[in-house]
């Protein structure tokens, strides 16, 4: 059996979607899986052991003709089934080009409801439902095999780690000389999803006061986030022995570094969600985005939110900065809980 999975973007969504791979392979080891991703995010899935062939489409660069050529060539693979985990019009069209036997969500289960017109097989599942439940639900629907979301608590790492690179990074960053290493991702895709720098600086000070032998690394993805991280250190007046800005990582290096951490803290963003994918302890900070939908809680993967009820997840209020009401002390409590009050 040969199937194709469509999940073009963005980083966090690809990281979360990739969990279905191990469920599929455990069900039937010999299923051949091809994955279609945007060229920009190819690095996160490159050399994935459960993906038999990865197709990178230059859609973000608006290279439509080139993308179409790749798709028409891939269509010759004669897929038994194609599954669109993205649920947008462009991803639905991609799935339709690849096969008539394509699976997606129905019009009531999509943000871009028009996309349902391109699917042959459609699943009804509430758009407000947890994303992992949605992804596993569509996978179950395609393979006619029930996958229990509760099994996510026992999943294997979603991404494999290059042990040689892990050792090199550990030596370069001198990780072994610290009792604990914490990675804090400062950014996110929207301003209102970012924990304020003044509060983050205070949180770092509180953590260091509680755990003097730890090292905090501030993760960033662009120049704006780099400047943000610099300001956090300046505002907190924190010693370089305890905090530093992480280097600019490739996606492969980010996976390896995340796996080396004792704790990862961050906003609702791709790099933060990588912690859950790699079974590393984490705290995800939610403001105006729904924690019940965008994350999966486990004993080691904690969430903190404002307690605000977000019922319409299709239309989130980008002017809502309620994330700033979350107290640093409440995040510290979760850190202490995960570190066992050492």
Swiss-Prot record:
Main location: membrane
EC annotation from Swiss-Prot or TrEMBL: 2.4.99.23
Catalytic reaction list: an alpha-Kdo-(2->4)-alpha-Kdo-(2->6)-lipid A + ADP-L-glycero-beta-D-manno-heptose = an L-alpha-D-Hep-(1->5)-[alpha-Kdo-(2->4)]-alpha-Kdo-(2->6)-lipid A + ADP + H(+)
Pathway linked to the protein: Bacterial outer membrane biogenesis; LPS core biosynthesis
Pfam families to which the protein is assigned, alphabetical: Glyco_transf_9
Keyword annotations of the record: Cell inner membrane, Cell membrane, Glycosyltransferase, Lipopolysaccharide biosynthesis, Membrane, Transferase
Family: Belongs to the glycosyltransferase 9 family.
Name under which the protein is recorded: Lipopolysaccharide heptosyltransferase 1
Organism of derivation: Campylobacter coli
Gene: waaC
């Amino acid at each position: 059996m040969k199937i194709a999975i469509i999940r073009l973007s963005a980083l966090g969504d690809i990281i979360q979607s990739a969990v279905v791979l191990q469920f599929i392979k455990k069900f039937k080891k010999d299923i051949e899986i091809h994955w279609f991703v945007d060229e920009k995010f190819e690095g996160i899935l490159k050399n994935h052991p459960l993906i038999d062939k990865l197709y990178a489409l230059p859609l973000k660069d608006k290279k439509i003709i080139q993308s179409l050529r790749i798709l028409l060539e891939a269509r010759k693979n004669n897929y038994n089934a194609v599954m669109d985990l993205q649920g947008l019009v462009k991803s639905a069209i991609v799935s339709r080009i690849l096969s008539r036997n394509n699976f997606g969500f129905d019009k009531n289960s999509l943000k871009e409801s028009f996309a349902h017109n391109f699917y042959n097989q459609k699943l009804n599942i509430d758009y407000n439902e947890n994303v992992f439940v949605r992804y596993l639900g569509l996978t179950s629907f395609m393979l006619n095999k029930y996958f229990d979301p509760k099994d996510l608590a026992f999943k294997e790492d979603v991404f494999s780690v290059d042990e040689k690179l892990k050792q090199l990074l550990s030596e370069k960053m001198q990780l072994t000389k610290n009792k604990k290493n914490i990675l804090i991702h400062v950014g996110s895709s929207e301003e209102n999803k970012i924990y304020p720098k003044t509060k983050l600086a205070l949180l770092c000070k509180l953590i260091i006061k509680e755990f003097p032998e730890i090292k905090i690394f501030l993760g960033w993805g662009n120049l704006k986030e780099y400047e943000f991280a610099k300001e956090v250190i300046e505002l907190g007046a924190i010693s370089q022995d305890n905090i530093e800005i992480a280097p600019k990582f490739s996606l492969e290096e980010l996976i390896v570094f995340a796996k080396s951490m004792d704790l990862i803290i961050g906003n609702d963003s791709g790099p933060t969600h990588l912690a859950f994918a790699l079974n590393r302890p984490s705290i995800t900070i939610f403001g105006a985005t729904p924690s019940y939908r965008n994350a999966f809680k486990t004993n080691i993967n904690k969430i903190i939110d404002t307690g605000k009820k977000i019922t319409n997840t299709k239309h989130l209020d980008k002017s809502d900065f309620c994330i700033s009401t979350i107290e640093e002390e409440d995040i510290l409590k979760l850190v202490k809980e995960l570190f066992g009050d050492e």
